[in-house]
Structures are given as structure tokens and as C-alpha cells.
């Protein structure tokens, strides 16, 4: 019996779907994380209301936050300030947000070396403060002339040195994928995880950002599962305008939270966003929303 190419492809697709679709018994036997995931909220220092660091910490603690995320620029000179401010509190440094000089995958050696020196200085401070890691974007639009292949090759070459410095300091490099309007390089969590796999160093990890993921990831769940154990930090914002979670219509994070629960995520979800209203009202409202959605995930 003759089979047309169209029929052959259709039958093949049906067979593949049947073969790859998990049965009920298979679904019940999916591996469970070594420990249940926790919802630990953090907020960037610049997002939290308050005129002083103490006022910001007081506000965050009063609303159930466990972490604060400072900017990396100037952090080496603020280590003692943070140590004193955090003494006797339950809140801690979650991660450190960038703030380094130079461009890590610049085509210019002197620009790369400037980035390496600056990143190491901030990593030392991040480690002293017990931060999960330092967020690193390899390059934004217009910061490098290297193509994707050369840029990736260079990044994989440079990261072991930075990862070793981070590991000795007690922290990590956190590679952050961005959306296509901000960079052409490194836009999905799976790509960042693949770089971590190739580098194979405990000092090199990944972070995800719900805002960037809105534009780049087909599935929040799949993105977090793909990142797996490499995922060590998460940013969150409203999904249309990058404001407080809940300030945009349809802000929903349940799919991603299911992914975080699936991998047993233990670290922070940190607010990196603006606010349409008074943050003293919008932040508590966002916290309530996230706790509700976490429970539903």
C-alpha cells in the first residue's frame, strides 16, 4: 500500500505524541525536589520606600520580606554600613544587582579587563555580606561587536576565573538573560543554563526575571525547569509595564511558581520594578498577590 508523504508525516507526528506523552503512572512518578520550595521575598534597595537604609529595612521587615537587594556600584565601600544595619534583623542581603564597570564580552581587551576587575571587587563585597550572588549581564545592545558564537565562546572562557573568585568569596556569578529590546545575547534561561553546564563551576549560576521572560519564554514553568539547579535568584515585576506585581491587568505568575516548586527553589524572588501608585500601598498589595498565587501554584 502506497503512503503519501503527507500521510506519513501525520502518522509519524501522532506516533511521536503518543510516545512522548506521559501516562498517569509516569506523571505520578516524576522526581520530587529534595526539599519543598519556599517563597522568600526580596526587594531592591532603590524600590523600597524610605529615606535611609534603616527606614527601608524597617518597612520591608514589617511586610514579611526576607531579603534586600543592593546595587553593586559602590558596594565595596558600603559593606560595614550594611553589616551594621542588618545586625539583629531577620532580613539579609539576597543578591547584588550588577553595578560593575566595563563589558564582559567586549571585543576590546582593556574593556573586558575593566569588567573583570570591577566584578571581582563587587563579588568580594557580596561574599562578605552573604549574598546569593552578583547579577551579571554579559553585554547590552551596542556594547560589543562580537557575534553570538564568538561572544559565547569568550564568555565560557572568562567565567571560570570569575566563578573561582566568587566561590572563594562565598557567593556566585548570576547570569541574567534579558529581553530582545535590551540585548541580542543571552535571552532565555535554557541558554544561560547551558553556559553554566559548559563552564561547570559552582561559582557560576543563573537568575530569571519574570519581566524579561514575558517577552522571551514560551512557558515560565518550562524556563525554570530548564534552569534547574543552576537557578539561584529571581526578579519579578508586572508583566506589561514593569511596575508592581498586580498593577497591570492579568498579572499572573502561577505557571512560573509551579516551575519553582517543581525544582525545589530555595532562594529569593526580588522586586525589580517601578510603581504606579504609592509604594507604601502597592508593595503590601503585591505581597498579598504573590502569596495567594504561590499557594495556588
List where the protein language model places each region:
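Histidine-acidic metal/acid-base catalytic patches
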Residues: 2-42, 51-61, 131-132, 186-208, ...
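Active-site acidic/histidine proton-transfer and metal-coordination neighborhood
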Residues: 7-20, 28, 33-36, 105, ...
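Hydrophobic anchor at the start of a short beta-strand
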Residues: 41, 93, 173
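Residue-level signal for pocket-adjacent positions within structured domains
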Residues: 42-43, 99-100, 180, 239-240
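Structural motif corresponding to the early beta-alpha repeats
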Residues: 47, 66, 70-163, 242-244, ...
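Conserved dinucleotide-binding and phosphotransfer motif residues
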Residues: 63, 89, 169
Amino acid at each position: 500500500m502506497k503512503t503519501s508523504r503527507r500521510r506519513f508525516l501525520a502518522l509519524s507526528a501522532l506516533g511521536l505524541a503518543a510516545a512522548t506523552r506521559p501516562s498517569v503512572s509516569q506523571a505520578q512518578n516524576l522526581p520530587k525536589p529534595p526539599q519543598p520550595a519556599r517563597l522568600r521575598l526580596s526587594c531592591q534597595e532603590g524600590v523600597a520606600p524610605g529615606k535611609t537604609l534603616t527606614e527601608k529595612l524597617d518597612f520591608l521587615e514589617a511586610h514579611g520580606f526576607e531579603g534586600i537587594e543592593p546595587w553593586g556600584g559602590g558596594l565595596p565601600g558600603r559593606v560595614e554600613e550594611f553589616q551594621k544595619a542588618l545586625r539583629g534583623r531577620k532580613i539579609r542581603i539576597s543578591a547584588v544587582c550588577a553595578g560593575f564597570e566595563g563589558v564582559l564580552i567586549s571585543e576590546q581587551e582593556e574593556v573586558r579587563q575593566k569588567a573583570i576587575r570591577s566584578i571581582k571587587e563587587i563579588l568580594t563585597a557580596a561574599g562578605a555580606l552573604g549574598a546569593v550572588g552578583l547579577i551579571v549581564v554579559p553585554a547590552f545592545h551596542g556594547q560589543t561587536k562580537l557575534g553570538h558564537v564568538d561572544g559565547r565562546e569568550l564568555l565560557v572562557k572568562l567565567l571560570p576565573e570569575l566563578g573561582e573568585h566568587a566561590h572563594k568569596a562565598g557567593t556566585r556569578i548570576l547570569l541574567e538573560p534579558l529581553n530582545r529590546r535590551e540585548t541580542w545575547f543571552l535571552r532565555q534561561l535554557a541558554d544561560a543554563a547551558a553556559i553554566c553546564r559548559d563552564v561547570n563551576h559552582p561559582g557560576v549560576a543563573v537568575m530569571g526575571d519574570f519581566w524579561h521572560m514575558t517577552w522571551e519564554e514560551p512557558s515560565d514553568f518550562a524556563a525554570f525547569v530548564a534552569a534547574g539547579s543552576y537557578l539561584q535568584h529571581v526578579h519579578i515585576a508586572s508583566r506589561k509595564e514593569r511596575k508592581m506585581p498586580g498593577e497591570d491587568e492579568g498579572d499572573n505568575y502561577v505557571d512560573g511558581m509551579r516551575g519553582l516548586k517543581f525544582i525545589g527553589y530555595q532562594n529569593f524572588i526580588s522586586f525589580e520594578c517601578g510603581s504606579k501608585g504609592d509604594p507604601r500601598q502597592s508593595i503590601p498589595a503585591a505581597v498579598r498577590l504573590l502569596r495567594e498565587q504561590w499557594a495556588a501554584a
